[in-house]
Amino acid sequence: MRKSSRNSKLRTSNWLARRFNLATSSACEGATFEDLTNSTGVLVVAGPKSRELLEKISTDDFSNENFKWLTAQDVNVGYAPVNAMRVNFVGELGWELHHPIEYQNHIFDKIMEAGKDLGIKPFGIRAMNSLRLEKSYKLVGTELSIEYSPYESGLDRFVHPNKGSFIGLEALNKWREKGFDNKLITLEVHNTKDADVLGNNPIYKDNKVVGRATGGEFGFRLDKSIALAMVKPEHSNVGDKLQVDILGEMYEATVIEESPYDSEN
C-alpha cells in the first residue's frame, strides 16, 4: 500500500495510475489499483508520553526494542485495527495511526480518555507546521516539489544512483553533472514583530534576490522565528547573513544548522 498526504491525493493517484497502465500486462497480472483515501483516516499521537499512552489502549508492544523508528506494524487500539507507523512530523516521540475511517471516533475517544492524566491536548495543522519547521522537516508541495531535485531539497541520503535503473535516474545524473542551482537551508529570522515568514517570501543578499522562503513560522520551543528557504548555493553556509521580505518589511536572517530543535533526536 502506498500512503501519502491527502493534499497529494490527486498527484499520487494519477502518477500511480499512469505507471500501472504503462506496465506490461504480465507485470500487472493479478494486481489492482484502488484509491482508498476516503475510506481511511490517520491520527497522530506525539510527545514524550506517547508510548505510555498507547500502551494503555493497546495490547501491542510499543517499546523501542520492538518498535523501531521508521518502521510500521499492524496493531490494535481498543477494538480498532490500526497500521501504526513510528514516524511523525513534530520532532518528538510519536506514531501515526492509520485506520479504517469508521473507527476514527472510537480511536480518538480512547486516546483522549487514556491521556487525561498524562496532560493530553489536541493540536492542529498550524501547530504541527511550527513544530516541523523547528526540525527542518520538509513538506511536499513546498520544500519538496518537481521544481527541485532531491539533492537540492536535502534528500541525499535517500538517493542511491548505483542501485540500478529507476524512473528519473537519467535526469538526475544530468542534473548532478551540470551542478545544482539551489540549496535548501534553515533560517533564523531576527526581530520579527506581528508576522513571520509564510512562504514564497523573497530572500535577499545586498539588495539582490538570491532565493525564496518555502515556509516559516514562530518556533515556540526555540522561542525564535524560523524559516526554510531555497537559495543559491553560495549563500547557504551556516552563519551567512541574508534578508527576508515579510509583508513589505525587510528582516535580517541567519543561516543556521539544520534541525535546530533536538538535532541529535
Descriptions of predicted regions:
Residues M1-K3, N7-N265:
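Conserved, structured C-terminal
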